[in-house]
Amino acid sequence: MSDSDSKRIDVEAPERVEQHELQVMPVGSTIEVPSLDSTPKLSKRNSSERSLPLRSYSKWSPTEQGATLVWRDLCVYTNVGGSGQRMKRIINNSTGAIQPGTLMALMGSSGSGKTTLMSTLAFRQPAGTVVQGDILINGRRIGPFMHRISGYVYQDDLFLGSLTVLEHLNFMAHLRLDRRVSKEERRLIIKELLERTGLLSAAQTRIGSGDDKKVLSGGERKRLAFAVELLNNPVILFCDEPTTGLDSYSAQQLVATLYELAQKGTTILCTIHQPSSQLFDNFNNVMLLADGRVAFTGSPQHALSFFANHGYYCPEAYNPADFLIGVLATDPGYEQASQRSAQHLCDQFAVSSAAKQRDMLVNLEIHMAQSGNFPFDTEVESFRGVAWYKRFHVVWLRASLTLLRDPTIQWLRFIQKIAMAFIIGACFAGTTEPSQLGVQAVQGALFIMISENTYHPMYSVLNLFPQGFPLFMRETRSGLYSTGQYYAANILALLPGMIIEPLIFVIICYWLTGLRSTFYAFGVTAMCVVLVMNVATACGCFFSTAFNSVPLAMAYLVPLDYIFMITSGIFIQVNSLPVAFWWTQFLSWMLYANEAMTAAQWSGVQNITCFQESADLPCFHTGQDVLDKYSFNESNVYRNLLAMVGLYFGFHLLGYYCLWRRARKL
């Protein structure tokens, strides 16, 4: 065993800590914790030595004294797929610590494991990730509570473009803040965040998308993402490539905001790719990764000194960040040599004095966590989230606003539906009298009404869940709401349109075509058309969640549509269906609706005009003759209505299950 190994304090995980060289400190003791940054800051704003923080371990709380995040011997494996479910190690025995007031840059070449390490430390790793090692924040193992005490700013900004900045922050505040926060307090928090992030003038501006005339700029969208994460005043903030896609001025303003947060005691970890020299100077700590291993941890100035001591000198007037990343990167054509060079630096850092100082801090933090019970646990557990029904209400209200403000989803379809009702009514006007030709016209009008409320509504919702799936996954991982709340809220937001739209359609179409003028016939027809549209939409939602893309969903849905159309009862009698397709009649809402609407039109009709009858072309004399022609039974009307209600809930249950399963896998 080497000297460095023999001097290392071997402290186990908090649940099984053993006492070796450290003396257990009594509760209430104050100890000086060594800082990982013992060098002057490169930024001109702070050229003096940083004072070493003092922590009273009897008052260890996330709000009063910040958060210290430590991890030891951390290995992270991800599933790379294949029949054998092969696991690939992304992070290799990483150890580190971040103290309150630290703005740390996590750097490395592409594929070095930056995002994987940060998402693991934030307890936001993807499903299927295997984590080994110890990760603690203020002496407590990380867990789902990290979503409450930390913020995570993703590289790509996901918003609902139809909402304004103020509306988005309002919705997020309702979902993130403690239920005991009053309306006035919530308003003041949002106003303060708008002022801090420079978004006060854009509060009423819609976030927008690429097709909108007035949208937020890239810098404003990034600041809005920061404002959302700062709502619950996190003690630790994780930022994944926060400057990506921003111009130099916006990037500088953003990093300046991070610097100010760190000065107030927030612990901040950022992955950053090729920052400018000016941006790099704002970070008081840097961690370099190479193929999942730690190549250096410490101040930027010490990083340059460490590399220089091993033969890598940064040229004059050269960006230090580019130099450090370039040394650890893999050069095309020299892959093996580049990897050996990077691994050599990792090996040298592992036995350096900086690594020993880091290990001492990590072991000390883990050991001191066993000195007593700290208020940190109490403060974490005292958080009271929003009640489930309020979460559901917020998600439903947001989905409803999106539908109302998106013309492609609601208003254009509504206008199209009214236009089609007038066209259909005009085509069948005066043709539905009780005669032999009238029978064909009535059945044709009924089928058109069914098909018009089947195909377009069903295909129009195929993009509903795939379009919002990335945002849904991000927010559910943050614990804002559940899969069931999200699915039910979106369906409930669709429901008013799914009732009003077919009702207006059937009112216009029914009276223009001159169908049977009895309350019973109209009522059954209206209920059938409303149910047809809702069942078709439910089927579309099921296929929307069952497949990853709209083209794939359509590829499977189109053949099923043809089967339902053929078995609707107008093209072929149900009794004559082949045995292989006998089951389709139980799933065909078009058949249920056609039978019920036909029965409502012809039951009780005793006289149908027949001008000429022959053996080859017999006439329909009564309404019962029409029902017998299609093998329909007037006693099945209410059964068919209930069957369509059952299909509606059945398709939605399948849709929810598919969405839940997809979310669980990712």
Curated annotation (Swiss-Prot):
Q: What does the record say about its membrane topology?
A: Multi-pass membrane protein
Q: Which SMART domains match?
A: AAA
Q: Return the annotated region ranges for Disordered.
A: 26-55
Q: Which ranges carry the ABC transporter domain?
A: 69-316
Q: Note the InterPro entries from the entry.
A: AAA+_ATPase, ABC2_TM, ABC_transporter-like_ATP-bd, ABC_transporter-like_CS, ABCG_dom, ABCG_transporters, P-loop_NTPase, Pigment_permease/Abcg
Which Gene3D superfamilies does the entry mention? P-loop containing nucleotide triphosphate hydrolases
Q: Which residues are glycosylated?
A: 607, 633
Question: What are its GO cellular component terms?
Answer: cytoplasmic vesicle membrane; pigment granule membrane; plasma membrane; presynapse
User: Where is it made, tissue-wise?
Assistant: Expressed in the eye, specifically in primary pigment cells, secondary pigment cells and retinula cells (at protein level).
Positions that bind ATP: 108-115
Q: What keywords sit in the KW lines?
A: ATP-binding, Cytoplasmic vesicle, Glycoprotein, Membrane, Nucleotide-binding, Pigment, Translocase, Transmembrane, Transmembrane helix, Transport
Effect of a null allele: Eyes are scarlet due to a defect in brown pigment production. In larval Malpighian tubules and pupal eyes, kynurenine uptake is impaired resulting in a severe decrease in 3-hydroxykynurenine production. In the head, levels of neurotransmitters histamine, dopamine and serotonin are reduced. In addition, in lamina photoreceptor terminals R1-R6, numbers of synaptic vesicles and capitate projections, which are sites of endocytosis of vesicle membrane, are reduced.
Give the superkingdom in one word.
Eukaryota
Keyword field contains Transmembrane: yes
Which family, according to the similarity comment? Belongs to the ABC transporter superfamily. ABCG family. Eye pigment precursor importer (TC 3.A.1.204) subfamily.
How does the record describe its quaternary structure? May form a heterodimer with w/white.
NCBIfam families per UniProt: 3a01204 (TIGR00955)
Q: What does this protein do?
A: ATP-dependent transporter of the ATP-binding cassette (ABC) family which transports various molecules including bioamines, neurotransmitters and metabolic intermediates. In the eye and probably in association with w/white, required for the transport of the eye brown pigment precursors, kynurenine and probably tryptophan, into pigment cell granules. In Malpighian tubules and pupal eyes, involved in kynurenine transport. Probably in association with w/white, plays a role in zinc storage granule biogenesis in Malpighian tubule principal epithelial cells.
Protein name as annotated: Protein scarlet
The organism's taxonomic lineage, starting at the top: Eukaryota, Metazoa, Ecdysozoa, Arthropoda, Hexapoda
**Gene name, please?**
st
